[in-house]
């Protein structure tokens, strides 16, 4: 069996690189880099398939990459010509934010603003532990600084708070007592 290793560009890169010279440098560089990556991927996949004797699959892979390359070039052309996009100096393209424009004259914008004013996006309120519960927690802390889960549940029942609150209280109390020492 004879292996054929392909090193020549298989997607007509000379023609494509000639076209790149007429474009501005940002989009030309983006386009050229995309073409290079796709051609390198195609070359390595085709070589691997040909090495194992799968010539039919290699042809299908080539067609797939040709379609990917055409889609890539179409996307670059759309970005260059479309008013929806701006190019950045570092070579990336972003779509302009049109959310506010789309939301104008709709109730969504009013609801959104009302939600901001009414504190819909505030974090959860702190759970307050009553003074009587704090006394019980202090007593339990003096007895044992690291209660296990069963002890935390018992303390939580006695205090009328959740076991999670008990666990957090003990963690915070240990940290406070450590920093004071």
Swiss-Prot record:
Residues 122-181 bind DNA. This is Mating-type protein A1. It comes from Pichia angusta. It is found in: Nucleus. Belongs to the MATA1 family. Its main location: nucleus. One of its GO terms (molecular function) is DNA-binding transcription factor activity, RNA polymerase II-specific. SMART domains: HOX. Mating type proteins are sequence specific DNA-binding proteins that act as master switches in yeast differentiation by controlling gene expression in a cell type-specific fashion. The keyword Transcription regulation applies. The keyword Glycosyltransferase does not apply. In P.angusta, all mating-type proteins (MATA1, MATALPHA1 and MATALPHA2) are encoded on one idiomorph, consistent with the fact that P.angusta is a homothallic haploid in which any strain can mate with any other strain. Keywords: DNA-binding, Homeobox, Nucleus, Transcription, Transcription regulation. Coiled coil: none annotated. GO terms for cellular component: nucleus.
């Amino acid at each position: 069996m004879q292996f054929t290793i392909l090193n020549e560009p298989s997607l007509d890169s000379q023609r494509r690189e000639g076209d790149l010279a007429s474009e501005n440098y940002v989009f030309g560089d983006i386009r050229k880099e995309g073409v290079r990556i796709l051609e390198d991927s195609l070359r390595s996949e085709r070589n691997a398939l040909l090495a194992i004797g799968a010539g039919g699959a290699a042809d299908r892979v080539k067609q797939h990459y040709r379609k990917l390359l055409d889609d890539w070039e179409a996307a670059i052309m759309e970005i260059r010509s479309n008013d929806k996009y701006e190019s950045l100096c570092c070579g990336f393209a972003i779509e302009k934010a049109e959310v506010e424009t789309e939301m104008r004259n709709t109730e969504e914008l009013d609801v959104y603003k009302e939600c901001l004013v009414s504190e819909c996006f505030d974090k959860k309120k702190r759970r307050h532990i009553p003074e009587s519960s704090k006394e019980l927690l202090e007593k339990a802390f003096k007895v044992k600084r690291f209660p296990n889960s069963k002890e935390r549940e018992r303390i939580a029942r006695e205090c009328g708070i959740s076991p999670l609150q008990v666990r957090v209280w003990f963690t915070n109390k240990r940290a406070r007592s450590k920093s004071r020492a």
